[in-house]
Amino acid sequence: MTAVSQKTTTPSANFSLFRIAFAVFLTYMTVGLPLPVIPLFVHHELGYSNTMVGIAVGIQFFATVLTRGYAGRLADQYGAKRSALQGMLACGLAGAAWLLAALLPVSAPVKFALLIVGRLILGFGESQLLTGTLTWGLGLVGPTRSGKVMSWNGMAIYGALAAGAPLGLLIHSHFGFAALAGTTMVLPLLAWAFNGTVRKVPAYTGERPSLWSVVGLIWKPGLGLALQGVGFAVIGTFISLYFVSNGWTMAGFTLTAFGGAFVLMRILFGWMPDRFGGVKVAVVSLLVETAGLLLLWLAPTAWIALVGAALTGAGCSLIFPALGVEVVKRVPAQVRGTALGGYAAFQDISYGVTGPLAGMLATSCGYPSVFLAGAISAVVGILVTILSFRRG
């Protein structure tokens, strides 16, 4: 234990953790750049419905869910570095599929199919990337710093969303979807090169419980995470169309407001889950998320909507590390990658289910209704978290 403790405090370990987080930022631009553009591309350029928009966005997360188990086993048994680098390469392939969708002279259904293929590849890549980098980071700095590892990764992810959303809209409006796709293809390859020399961490040995027994240990924090995820899913999927329907500009900056507030909270308060425990931090965070989504639901102007998006980002920021601290406490070291992958899968399921369901709700009741649904989910998340951990 002493050796581990000393290792976790070395500057070299922290610098390696920074390199991993920066690579996550570069790779996750593959998600951030096209996120506000894909709904516009599917709805306006290909002429498909809101439900198809939801499918195009949400199907990525189903692919992530279905490959989380593989990603966890890969990280646990063969090394987290391999999982992370493999994920970066897959994310680059997703950009290649979108480039084909943009350049090939084919019909709208074929373009949509290529878009879906790219989203599926991206989902596979994301599961390898995030499971690998979380397990890699824990191996570098130790499980007592699990909140720090999750906070740094989260800052990278949502920093990429904050920067990527307006940049993606800018690239698309000036240079077209092909330029956007090419950019998303190159950035993960740069990340791969940047992380190539970061040292490996050894795979843990020991008896490995079954996946279902691991799920039995993590489902309570996972359920709270899933209910939190509805809020981000409705913003990521429908905020561009919501702004267009109201005649508002600055749609891309809603994700900047969300991501900026998210990152700021991680910088200022990312230490809280390690210090105070996950449950208290998660409950307060869900309250803030609820307030932000209610503002989006009722927003009379674009500026109020931006404030709502920022509040939602601030609320979502600490929930993953807060409840993730509880996951790390519950599982043995040799299945930590599997447990973190399974935990993140709850959020992926939430994202995947929310897209098409919210699309049907938006068609029936209008775009504001999806933000009300997100707020209700966050309130349910508060109740589930309080009741689950009180009984536990």
UniProtKB/Swiss-Prot annotation:
Key word tRNA-binding present: no
Compartment annotation: Cell inner membrane
Molecular function via GO: transmembrane transporter activity
Major location (coarse): membrane
Transmembrane segments: 22-42, 46-66, 97-117, 121-141, 151-171, 174-194, 224-244, 252-272, 276-298, 342-362, 369-389
The entry's keywords: Cell inner membrane, Cell membrane, Membrane, Transmembrane, Transmembrane helix, Transport
Pfam families registered for this protein in UniProt: MFS_1
Coiled-coil parts of chain: none
GO annotation, cellular component aspect: plasma membrane
Superkingdom to which the source organism belongs: Bacteria
Membrane topology value: Multi-pass membrane protein
UniProt similarity note: Belongs to the major facilitator superfamily. YfcJ family.
Protein name (database record): Uncharacterized MFS-type transporter YfcJ
Organism whose genome encodes this protein: Salmonella newport (strain SL254)
Gene of this entry: yfcJ
